[in-house]
């Protein structure tokens, strides 16, 4: 089986992290976002993954060649010369997707969940139509485009953009499975699959919805990245609790790379991910944070709801909070207060940042 992953975007919502690393390679819970998806696809029997790429594709290609060997699969890159939206990339990769008549998966690159690929395939084969989209339940449907479908069969009737009156609380979760016949609908030009292709398929009775069980998050921006981390760690707690760090000083769900070094009298958690080679000195307090590879947090600093970029350094007695994001190789001097700052790569912070802002 095959899968196409849409990784062509610039990752602007996840800046400053994506200024130096393409979004699919940003580590989410100590593994690149893309690998969470690819490994789940391989588990479900996918043997050929096609990446629809544009931005920073050399870095992606290098990383994926190594993974190709490790996972024993084929990975192809389909290069967009211009942005093709969410449907155009399927037309661009048409030849790769249609060399047999098997259905294929399509994924948005920002989605994290308990990927239900086996269930999707079964459901798709049962109804026998051209397309299946996974839907997930949300608390505030008025913020999203919702999917209206028959509860028993899953047949989709229509899509409603940001409804002011309740019609459904199910939204498109960014995971699809299609039969190759569906590709005849798409031309090689910038096209939105959600706005231009799906409504026509639904009208013709060719599109079905499968409801996702378990957690789901679009982790394309920092606050959602952190929320998604909390959900993912809770899922690890339920399915593989031995992967989480326990013991004195660790509270709740904490994932620590074995190469990280943690000093005395630290309090870590709940909901913390600590990457490879990270150093936390004595007396550090961290909650609801992701600390990426090679970062160094000096003694007695206090971090909550932050993402600390690769090889960044946070001084002593610093307080950082409110979705502060440090890009790669940022230095924060001692005894500063950082509130909701977005700090671009390779910057040094010498003064406190009392109000949320971008530091360039």
Curated annotation (Swiss-Prot):
InterPro entries recorded: GMPPB_C, GMPPB_N, Hexapep_transf_CS, Mannose-1P_guanyltransferase, NTP_transferase_dom, Nucleotide-diphossugar_trans
Annotated cofactor note: Coordinates binding with substrate and required for enzymatic activity.
Keywords: GTP-binding, Magnesium, Metal-binding, Nucleotide-binding, Nucleotidyltransferase, Transferase
Region span, Hexapeptide repeat domain: 245-360
The organism's place on the tree of life at top rank: Eukaryota
Sequence segments annotated as region (Substrate-binding domain): 2-222
Record-listed Mg(2+) binding positions: 110, 218
Gene3D superfamilies documented for this protein: Hexapeptide repeat proteins, Spore Coat Polysaccharide Biosynthesis Protein SpsA, Chain A
EC number annotated for this UniProt entry: 2.7.7.13
Activity regulation, free text: Enzyme activity is reduced by incorporation into the GMPPA-GMPPB mannose-1-phosphate guanylyltransferase complex. Allosterically inhibited, when part of the GMPPA-GMPPB complex, by GDP-alpha-D-mannose binding to GMPPA.
Family: Belongs to the transferase hexapeptide repeat family.
The protein's assembly and partners: Component of the GMPPA-GMPPB mannose-1-phosphate guanylyltransferase complex composed of 4 gmppa subunits and 8 gmppb subunits; the complex is organized into three layers, a central layer made up of 2 gmppa dimers sandwiched between two layers each made up of 2 gmppb dimers. Catalytic activity of gmppb is reduced when part of the complex and binding of GDP-alpha-D-Mannose by gmppa induces allosteric feedback inhibition of gmppb.
Domain comment as written in the entry: The N-terminal substrate-binding domain adopts a Rossman-like fold and has a binding pocket for GTP or GDP-alpha-D-mannose. Substrate binding is coordinated by an Mg(2+) ion. The C-terminal domain consists of a series of tandem hexapeptide repeats that adopt a beta-helix conformation. The beta-helix forms several protein interaction surfaces involved in assembly of the GMPPA-GMPPB mannose-1-phosphate guanylyltransferase complex.
Protein's recorded name: Mannose-1-phosphate guanylyltransferase catalytic subunit beta
Lineage, broadest ranks: Eukaryota, Metazoa, Chordata, Craniata, Vertebrata
């Amino acid at each position: 089986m095959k899968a196409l992953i849409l990784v062509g975007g610039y990752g602007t919502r996840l800046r400053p992290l994506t200024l130096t690393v393409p979004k699919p390679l940003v580590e989410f819970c100590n593994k690149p976002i893309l690998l969470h998806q690819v490994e789940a696809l391989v588990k479900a029997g996918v043997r050929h993954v096609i990446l629809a790429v544009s931005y920073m594709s050399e870095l992606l290609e290098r990383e994926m060649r190594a993974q190709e060997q490790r996972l024993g699969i084929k990975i192809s890159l389909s290069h967009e010369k211009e942005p093709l939206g969410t449907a155009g990339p399927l037309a661009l990769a048409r030849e790769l997707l249609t060399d047999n008549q098997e259905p294929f998966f399509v994924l948005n690159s920002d989605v994290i969940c308990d990927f239900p690929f086996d269930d999707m395939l079964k459901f798709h084969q049962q109804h026998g139509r051209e397309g299946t989209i996974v839907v997930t339940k949300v608390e505030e449907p008025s913020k999203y485009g919702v999917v209206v479908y028959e509860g028993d069969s899953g047949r989709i009737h229509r899509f409603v953009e940001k409804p002011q009156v309740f019609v459904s609380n199910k939204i498109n979760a960014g995971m699809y499975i299609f039969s190759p016949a569906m590709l005849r609908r798409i031309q090689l030009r910038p096209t939105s699959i959600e706005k231009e292709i799906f409504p026509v398929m639904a009208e013709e009775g060719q599109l079905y919805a499968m409801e996702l069980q378990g957690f789901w998050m679009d982790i394309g921006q920092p606050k959602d990245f952190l929320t998604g981390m909390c959900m993912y760690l809770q899922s690890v707690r339920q399915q593989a609790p031995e992967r989480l760090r326990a013991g004195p000083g660790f509270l709740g769900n904490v994932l620590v790379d074995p190469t990280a070094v943690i000093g005395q009298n630290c309090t870590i958690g709940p909901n913390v991910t600590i990457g490879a080679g990270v150093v936390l000195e004595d007396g550090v307090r961290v909650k609801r944070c992701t600390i990426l590879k090679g970062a160094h947090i000096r003694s007695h600093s206090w971090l909550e709801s932050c993402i600390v970029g690769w090889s960044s350094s946070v001084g002593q007695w610093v307080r950082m909070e409110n979705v502060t994001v440090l890009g790669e190789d940022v230095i924060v001097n001692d005894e500063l207060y950082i509130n909701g700052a977005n700090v671009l790569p390779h910057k040094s912070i010498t003064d406190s940042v009392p109000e949320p802002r971008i530091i360039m």
